[in-house]
Amino acid sequence: TVFSLWDTYRNLSQLETLLYPDKQVDMINSMIDMYREWGWMPKWELFSRETWTMEGDPAIPYIADAYMRGLRGFDINEAYKAFRTSATTEGKNNRMRPDIDPYIERGYVPMGYYAADMSGDNSVSHALEYYLADNALSILAGELGHKADAKLFRQRALGYKHYYSKESGTLRPITMDGKFLSPFNPEDGYDFTNAPGFHEGSAWNYTFYAPHDVLGMAKLMGGQRKFCDKLQMVFDKGLYDPANEPDIAYPYL
């Protein structure tokens, strides 16, 4: 009855694929049927109605992961068509990625493009979800023989580097003029309070969120030792928040 995909693509969908493959195939077919009915995969569906809650393009990592683990019984080419539509359609006609235009043109989503009210701006969170989705799409494209797409989407997926600020040592929102937000406190957003750039979390809850390029992120931070030291500091200072999804994988990094 609910495809709360922002919540579930990170770990629950993999568990479902491993333990309940037949039911997972049924759910994926339902998702593809939703696309056939109205042109978009579900994002955060509730009782057969799309709510557009949260951000990203979560059907991509959800279904791509299942396919790469060997699940069949659904039309992967139809799913790929849906994924490519949301990853390439211009923003004014894109229900899944309404702020895709600067994401493609600049490699990131600036503050204020999607939400004029800075307290409700989730630009960094939006872009991070797009990077991960595009990486999953790149892997699927390669598996299906779409080599040019695989290269394109992998290049996009590395755009997270735009957000890394050496000054703060975290990912940091970027303003419309291409500068890092200032003043900036990476602890803003703790305990689900509003913070410019981040949805339901602080910069510390999102800074390590490049699971598709962990070694690349470590290089940005000055190497694997500094990466690990910074991660340890997050735990030591109580900046880790397992109550929400973006940083739940931190213990496994």
Give a label for each model feature.
Residues S4-R10, I60, G73-L253:
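Active-site core of glycosidic bond-cleaving carbohydrate-active enzymes
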Residues V2-D7, W52-E55:
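Active-site nucleophile and cofactor-binding loops and adjacent substrate-binding regions
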Residues S13:
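Conserved kinase catalytic-core segment
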Residues M34, E45-F47, D57-L71, A82, ...:
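A contiguous strand-loop segment
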Residues P21-L46, A243:
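Active-site-surrounding "flap" and adjacent substrate/cofactor-binding loops of secreted or lumenal enzymes
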Residues R49-T53, V124-H126:
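The substrate-binding groove and active-site-proximal loops of carbohydrate-active enzymes
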